[in-house]
Amino acid sequence: FCMRDVSHQCIGEELNGHGRQNANMMGKFVENISESKDYCSYWEIDWNNLPASADYVSDQDFWYNLNANFDVMNACYRLYLWTGNEVYINDPRFEEFFRLSANEYIDRWQLQADKIMERPGVMHEDDARVDPKFKTFRGLPSYEESVRGLTVTGDLIATIYRGLKSYAQIQRLGGNEEAALHYESKVEE
């Protein structure tokens, strides 16, 4: 299961009676964020709860679309609104994923408003590695995967916007108005 696909199809899957599966998949995505992967998670996870071998060699060599963290944030907020399941907004694994995505992830991948237009297209690559499988696919700035050399795209900006708006709302639901206003102001930058 893939971060993008699960995020985009989760409400339909709720309608199909797959709420337990949604919570499980989202939980797997959020619990696998790590500094060693530059605050990415696993793009795809297989039925053995392992990163899909088609997209992952190691924590330094893997496929990742930068939109994914923000799509998961928004999907979790929508799932909470749809189901009332507080796991999506109060579980410590989810809270940590949201916090890291809204801060360290943005910083690590230069997704701030004052840097996003000038960021390099390929980042965080160790040149000492011989023939990395995913050199130009680790940190794709779009879900458009066939165009090389992109540094920023409209779909990335849109997912950042929506993810941070969702996180601000989650903060507000938790009674943290100051944090909600902070993340809303980041959106307006």
What are these regions (language model features)?
Residues 17-40, 81, 94-114, 185-189:
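Long, well-ordered core segments of solenoidal/helical folds
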